[in-house]
Amino acid sequence: MENLGVGEGAEACSRLSRSRGRHSMTRAPKHLWRQPRRPIRIQQRFYSDPDKSAGCRERDLSPRPELRKSRLSWPVSSCRRFDLENGLSCGRRALDPQSSPGLGRIMQAPVPHSQRRESFLYRSDSDYELSPKAMSRNSSVASDLHGEDMIVTPFAQVLASLRTVRSNVAALARQQCLGAAKQGPVGNPSSSNQLPPAEDTGQKLALETLDELDWCLDQLETLQTRHSVGEMASNKFKRILNRELTHLSETSRSGNQVSEYISRTFLDQQTEVELPKVTAEEAPQPMSRISGLHGLCHSASLSSATVPRFGVQTDQEEQLAKELEDTNKWGLDVFKVAELSGNRPLTAIIFSIFQERDLLKTFQIPADTLATYLLMLEGHYHANVAYHNSLHAADVAQSTHVLLATPALEAVFTDLEILAALFASAIHDVDHPGVSNQFLINTNSELALMYNDASVLENHHLAVGFKLLQAENCDIFQNLSAKQRLSLRRMVIDMVLATDMSKHMNLLADLKTMVETKKVTSLGVLLLDNYSDRIQVLQNLVHCADLSNPTKPLPLYRQWTDRIMAEFFQQGDRERESGLDISPMCDKHTASVEKSQVGFIDYIAHPLWETWADLVHPDAQDLLDTLEDNREWYQSKIPRSPSDLTNPERDGPDRFQFELTLEEAEEEDEEEEEEGEETALAKEALELPDTELLSPEAGPDPGDLPLDNQRT
């Protein structure tokens, strides 16, 4: 390109411009499943350093811990948050075809939101990466395209890095084009004066591009082809969480118990236990029917003339109506609804929601059939179970209803999808026995045998919920077409199975990867033009509703906490009586309620709701504020007892240890070897004479220094 004439240089620039235009105007492929009613626009969050606002066009190349160049502006208390609505960062170049005079309006977030903590997902994962190059990409690309938007999922980081490479190559080509155009006829003496600045800039961009390519190649070369890109984020988040929980387990005995509970419940950790012996009398019989069902043949069917206003008979109908006025609001007091509805909160709330959304008319659901089914369904929730009863189902269903109505999701989902989400939330814990999946597996229960230890309770809830439709006058889907019915069943199954808490980290990683990938590739537009993307959002929506207790007003949250702990303690008592090891947080003599809630918020609820808030920004900001306030309340209630403090270096038999897979163990060994080699090299470098240390040839690469020497 150095010998291009004026005409050829202009033609090359024109080709480059057309190429960039085609790249920026790339349209999404035609839908594979159905056309979405409206795409979701993901608003990008920016964390800007006030000291750098004047020079936002300049790329930060200052050394940082473990980084050769800046890839992330870590959130600190002094940082101010900015939201970019339908616009681009201040670093957008004027030549970028994606920029326009109408874009780029920066809106400062309200003050209460600016100081909110970030979840553990934004912490460094460098201690667990496979190579020094990978270690240089702990977070997002601070590029002109993305400003300082924080990106933490590996696949989105790869895409962002490749876009930076493309931008650099385009800039190099543009410089060559401009240089050729200015050079004019060969032999023009003035052209030599323009070369040095272009060469300096070109060398800088070339080195930066090589660095980006090296990191992308490293990520892609270590990607296991049989796993999805979402698993890259899932594995990364699990490694970070394991490290955080290990630190927590070293602080105290109660911290150790909280760590073990979170790991076993939300990380799908399998533990080996000694199962009780099965005697001849206890030997399970062949099963041909769903257990736990009763009253299918002689249900108390209602007639259309006798259907109460809210589906339940109550002498406090007016008070109930007043309470249900808050059905569309976050934080409905379902305990009060239960009192006013004769302990039928699920029936009253679902009946009210279906009327509010006009679903009875849309799907031709007879009111008496709906009321009969809901009463039958609620009757199969166990009133003697402290937490997983019809109160919880009603709360999750109402929370799902409110989340579906969030402005960011307006007109996104079809009526059938909304019906499926509400139905899934209503049945998601029906016939729950008040014990965990692991308890059923450990006790060789009938349900565990029937469902082969895989999402035992979730499969059972689905079976019961659908089986009840076969009772007399209970088929609320009788007027759906065969195609609609199959589609609804598929969605409900996917959503209820996703409420298995052992799948939490995979759900979270997939959602965060989706959100960040769309930020990088589509200017924040999430089209949801296929079933996989749409059901992923719905799964996370119901999962958020299922884990919404910490986002509710504190009086409600405390009642839910009391109930879940009572259920845990009941399971612990049963385990103690059966001679089994007591599950984490189920021993009423040692469990710390306050620490359990702080740990649950820090490592489970906060990362999930933070990611959901990114998807629907700014609609969930108040929920995050409530979550933070509730965490601080429980944190303030943790007893400061000296007897609870233990030696962090203790190695007692009750200390929780994370089990590593064979693959993770090999990675740990490789990291230890690399760290030892790097430490030895660093020591040799430090022993060199000062003159050699000042020499560029003798000095070690900053990226090769051990971690401790890079931290500032």
Curated annotation (Swiss-Prot):
Pathway the protein acts in: Purine metabolism; 3',5'-cyclic AMP degradation; AMP from 3',5'-cyclic AMP: step 1/1
Chain positions recorded as Zn(2+) 2 binding sites: D429
Protein name: 3',5'-cyclic-AMP phosphodiesterase 4C
Comp. bias intervals (Acidic residues): 664-678
Keywords: cAMP, Cell projection, Cilium, Hydrolase, Manganese, Metal-binding, Phosphoprotein, Zinc
Record's GO cellular component terms: cilium; cytosol; extracellular space
Positions of 3',5'-cyclic AMP binding: H388, Q597, F600
Binding site for Mg(2+): D429
GO molecular function ontology, one term from the record: 3',5'-cyclic-GMP phosphodiesterase activity
Reported regulation of activity: Inhibited by rolipram.
Bias (Basic and acidic residues): 48-64
Pfam families named among the record's database cross-references: PDE4_UCR (PF18100), PDEase_I (PF00233)
UniProt similarity note: Belongs to the cyclic nucleotide phosphodiesterase family. PDE4 subfamily.
The organism's place on the tree of life at top rank: Eukaryota
Cited SUPFAM superfamilies: HD-domain/PDEase-like (SSF109604)
Subcellular location: Cell projection, Cilium
Top enzyme category: hydrolase
Primary residence: other
Keyword Disulfide bond: no
Reaction catalysed by this enzyme: 3',5'-cyclic AMP + H2O = AMP + H(+)
Biased composition regions of type Basic residues, renumbered to the chain: 17-31
Taxonomic source organism: Homo sapiens (Human)
GO terms under biological process: cAMP catabolic process; cAMP-mediated signaling
